[in-house]
């Protein structure tokens, strides 16, 4: 394989502010290096010490890492613990009256819940689940809006050793059905409806539809949280109201102690083709990853008000809403709505209102807010912020700079985090008191995370260069299996040609300082006239143009060049048509030529009012590839938030 070429030049560097560095959990580069050295000298000992310090064990482990059945690795296997105990009970002695969750509803209503109150609610609901016949190892589907109830449901499952599988409330009945069948769910927890952006989203109706599709005989009961009071169909033999089953129980439920390798949850990855892929995570190793990344990457302190904007239907909402913050006894904001309702100032108004100190959101949200109101943050008091984070995709340098300057006022470090559903927790991200920042780079691997960049045959790429991103050693929070499909797990993540390396599926470039730059998914690498170009870099160049709000690049087969470059562009102003579109397309082509080089100039530019995205905000590139080739869209688009946009994007401005 020829190395993937990095054509993006980014020379801006931002060192940690001295006041931040002095107070940081890991202070200065020597502090980071000392942790990395400790992991290198005694890898299993490094993780064992952290597991003993940070997790409350009912039975301490004596085995650290079992590699006897690789790649099905086991961590802390003879230890016993309970995730709910670690997230709630252990805080009751000293922090019972501390606010655990600040819930802000779509309409702005706020409800707070303390750790004592959370403990009572989780215990009552766990008892209700037991009364419905749910026990150790049973699978429970959770299909709820963002709410205190969603977190209570997850924690209640963990408390009794049931395995939860959360399905994002934006997914269709068909997607829900696939997951119910694949996981063999015994019980489904849902709501009558959710509320997003002032509009109701039917949930119970989707559950009813999913169960009618057949093959769901495993489901015995459906528990319904009454969020809106809307009329819904009711099956008295199967359905039960949440408030009724919870009210009937007492508020004490002893935790069920489970093996460290007991599955805590199964989460299906979005955007995969074919049958859904149920990523299975452990209890002990997963919890350790969530805790350490909260401490290292977010520099978490007891006084912080933490806000991760992700829905619990995604891995980010598992690790950095439902588990990580609670395991540290944090106070966090939980948000039901969307960033643009009732207007584009919603996030900033909430940061001011709740005095948020750590704010973690997606580049997609940042870019949309730049477009809708780039100056809006100036109208709010954001002085409580001390750290910003991004998650879900690489962030373009220009969006990074806006976030840093306008939101963070050039004093808040940005934790650009690379990780995956499969990794469980952050893998590459800056330790903010130790690592200099470069806009667009996720910087360096966390201590104890051994990353590399290799050729397609697994050969290590020395020094600077681009290739496949891999993990060289097993880590505690890693995926344990694909539910019910170990062979698919082995082939997808540990292909034979990589000789035991974990294949992330992303391409990356390492610069002269050892910083990692994510260049896109492996299938987002273009081969243009023999040059391998990362789509991310061309997108970043386009977004750096003052006219452009958002861009996506895909390849299209070309007789001469191998692949031609097709750009889908959303402008900050109105979508241009006719001659205006051709003129702007020409300007953007020249811009990319100057920013990167003639090789990267898009052959085609198509303008849209938006890009096709999943309901979590990820660009659906497979649809863009089909559009570029002129193919009919025949694949499942149930997760597509804005289907009407596809017709706009069929038209080329030249």
Curated annotation (Swiss-Prot):
Keywords: Acetylation, ATP-binding, Ligase, Magnesium, Metal-binding, Nucleotide-binding. It comes from Methylobacillus flagellatus (strain ATCC 51484 / DSM 6875 / VKM B-1610 / KT). Acetylated. Deacetylation by the SIR2-homolog deacetylase activates the enzyme. Its EC number is 6.2.1.1. It comes from the Bacteria. InterPro entries: Ac_CoA_lig (IPR011904), ACAS_N (IPR032387), AMP-bd_C (IPR025110), AMP-bd_C_sf (IPR045851), AMP-binding_CS (IPR020845), AMP-dep_synth/lig_dom (IPR000873), ANL_N_sf (IPR042099). Its cofactor is Mg(2+). GO terms for biological process: acetyl-CoA biosynthetic process from acetate. ATP binds at residues 392-394, 416-421, 506, 521, 532. It catalyses: acetate + ATP + CoA = acetyl-CoA + AMP + diphosphate. The modification N6-acetyllysine is found at residue 618. The keyword Ligase applies. Belongs to the ATP-dependent AMP-binding enzyme family. Mg(2+) binds at residues 543, 548. Pfam families: ACAS_N (PF16177), AMP-binding (PF00501), AMP-binding_C (PF13193). GO terms for cellular component: cytosol. Catalyzes the conversion of acetate into acetyl-CoA (AcCoA), an essential intermediate at the junction of anabolic and catabolic pathways. AcsA undergoes a two-step reaction. In the first half reaction, AcsA combines acetate with ATP to form acetyl-adenylate (AcAMP) intermediate. In the second half reaction, it can then transfer the acetyl group from AcAMP to the sulfhydryl group of CoA, forming the product AcCoA. PANTHER family: ACETYL-COENZYME A SYNTHETASE, ACETYL-COENZYME A SYNTHETASE 1. CoA binds at residues 196-199, 316, 529. This is Acetyl-coenzyme A synthetase. The lineage of its organism: Bacteria, Pseudomonadati, Pseudomonadota, Betaproteobacteria, Nitrosomonadales. GO terms for molecular function: acetate-CoA ligase activity; AMP binding; ATP binding; metal ion binding.
């Amino acid at each position: 394989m020829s190395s993937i070429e990095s054509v993006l030049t980014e020379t801006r560097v931002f060192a940690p502010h001295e006041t931040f560095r002095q107070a940081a959990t890991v202070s200065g580069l020597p502090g980071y290096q000392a942790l990395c050295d400790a992991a290198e000298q005694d890898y299993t000992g490094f993780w064992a010490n952290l597991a003993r310090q940070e997790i409350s064990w009912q039975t301490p482990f004596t085995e650290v890492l079992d590699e006897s059945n690789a790649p099905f690795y086991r961590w802390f296997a003879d230890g016993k613990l309970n995730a709910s105990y670690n997230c709630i009970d252990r805080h009751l002695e000293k922090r019972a009256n501390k606010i655990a969750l600040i819930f802000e509803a779509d309409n702005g209503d706020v409800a707070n819940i303390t750790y004592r109150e959370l403990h009572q609610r989780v215990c009552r609901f766990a008892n209700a689940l037991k009364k419905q016949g749910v026990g150790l190892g049973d699978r429970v589907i959770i299909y709820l809006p963002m709410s205190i109830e969603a977190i209570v449901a997850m924690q209640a499952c963990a408390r009794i050793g049931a395995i939860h599988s959360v399905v994002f409330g934006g997914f269709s009945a068909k997607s829900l059905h696939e997951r119910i069948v694949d996981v063999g769910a015994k019980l489904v927890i849902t709501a009558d409806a959710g509320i997003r952006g002032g509009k109701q989203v039917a949930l119970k109706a989707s559950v009813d539809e999913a169960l009618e599709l057949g093959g769901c005989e495993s489901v015995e009961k459906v528990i319904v949280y009454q969020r809106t009071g809307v009329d819904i169909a009711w099956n008295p033999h199967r359905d039960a109201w949440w408030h009724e089953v919870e009210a009937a129980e007492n508020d004490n439920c002893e935790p069920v102690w489970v093996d460290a390798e007991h599955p805590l949850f199964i989460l299906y990855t979005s955007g995969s083709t074919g049958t859904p892929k149920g990523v299975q995570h452990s209890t002990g190793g997963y919890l350790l990853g969530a805790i350490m990344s909260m401490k290292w990457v977010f520099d978490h302190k007891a006084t912080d008000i933490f806000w991760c904007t992700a829905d619990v239907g995604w891995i980010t909402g598992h690790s950095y809403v439902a588990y990580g913050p609670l395991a540290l006894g944090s106070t966090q904001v939980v948000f039901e709505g969307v960033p643009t309702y009732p207007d584009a100032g919603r996030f900033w108004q909430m940061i001011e209102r709740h005095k948020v100190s750590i704010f973690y959101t997606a580049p997609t949200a940042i870019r949309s807010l730049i477009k809708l109101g780039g100056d809006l943050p100036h109208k709010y008091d954001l002085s409580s912020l001390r750290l910003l984070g991004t998650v879900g995709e690489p962030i373009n340098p220009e969006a990074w700079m806006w976030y840093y300057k306008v939101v963070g006022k050039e004093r808040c470090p940005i934790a650009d985090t690379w990780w995956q559903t499969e990794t469980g927790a952050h893998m590459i991200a800056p330790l903010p008191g130790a690592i200099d920042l470069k806009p667009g780079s996720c910087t360096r691997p966390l201590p104890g995370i051994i990353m590399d960049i290799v050729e397609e045959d697994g050969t290590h790429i020395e020094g600077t260069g681009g290739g496949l991103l891999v993990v060289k050693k097993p880590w505690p929070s890693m995926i344990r299996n694909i539910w019910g499909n170990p062979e698919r797990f082995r082939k997808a993540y540990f292909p034979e040609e990589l000789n035991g390396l974990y294949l992330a599926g992303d391409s990356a470039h390492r610069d002269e300082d050892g910083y990692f730059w994510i260049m896109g998914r492996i299938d987002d690498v273009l081969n243009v006239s023999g040059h391998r170009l990362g789509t991310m870099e061309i997108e970043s160049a386009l977004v750096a143009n003052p006219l452009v709000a958002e861009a996506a690049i895909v390849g299209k087969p070309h007789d001469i060049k191998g692949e031609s470059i097709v750009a889908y562009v959303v402008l900050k102003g109105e979508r241009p048509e006719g001659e205006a579109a051709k003129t702007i397309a020409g300007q953007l082509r020249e811009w990319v030529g100057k920013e990167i080089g003639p090789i990267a100039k898009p052959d085609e530019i198509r303008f849209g009012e938006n890009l096709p995205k999943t309901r979590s905000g990820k660009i659906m590139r497979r649809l863009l590839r089909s559009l570029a080739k002129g193919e009919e869209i025949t694949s499942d688009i149930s997760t597509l938030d804005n289907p009407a946009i596809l017709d706009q994007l069929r038209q080329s401005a030249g």
